[in-house]
């Protein structure tokens, strides 16, 4: 009987341990997967610094182009498209975290004027939904609905990202006015070179931390290298760790200098930022303009008719 109770206790403990381990795995996996596209959100209250620089450039060091297309003018309480273009060579492959080569992903941050926000699903037309695809946009902060982020998403499918934007209505939002507003955008393709904690990823160049002679290069079992450098100044050994996926530029016995590249640069992506302007137009001004243009057209028509009438009178007088 005691043996049976012992086995039962062991079985319960094993089951509990497995459940706890599984729960930890799920929580950890979820936090990692959801944290990757929101590194900037976790570390910066505002994605645009006072200098105008978007903080994504702190991790994505290479400079690449990005473009944004928005209408010149929009009316209050209407939905419009903001199209962010992140061009790159679709044939390129990047170094993944596991050291293998894979396709590039893309991401973007869109900084709208105060009052502008992501359009609700019921306001988005079927044509616009088709352009958006399966993208899921997030607010940068719960209280910053005018700043939107997306990514990482497959670059081959979403090198052009369509944001559905709802324009504010000054009639219901007294903080909004009929003015010209700036829009800022940042877009990246590929992985970053630096993590938010300041450590390097395996998508950048690794340099020698000391000058001297390379006495040993050890290839690690799971990939990557340990490079032992004998410091020329004091004879001590310095070991530089190279993560997997990188190509070495040095060999054993070679003399190297401090900060000399030990690997080639694997990065094929980069980050870019741009801006555009949009006018929130007063409908009354549009109506006034249409009325003015209509008046001008009518005046021209009356002038033409008057001229023809005058010509007829002159012609009849000449006939007499």
From Swiss-Prot:
It comes from the Eukaryota. Its cofactor is heme. Heme binds at residues 36, 56, 59-60. GO terms for molecular function: electron transfer activity; heme binding; iron ion binding. Binds 1 heme group covalently. One of its GO terms (cellular component) is chloroplast thylakoid membrane. Disulfide bonds: none annotated. Residues 1-35 form the signal peptide. The chain crosses the membrane at residues 286-306. Belongs to the cytochrome f family. This is Cytochrome f.
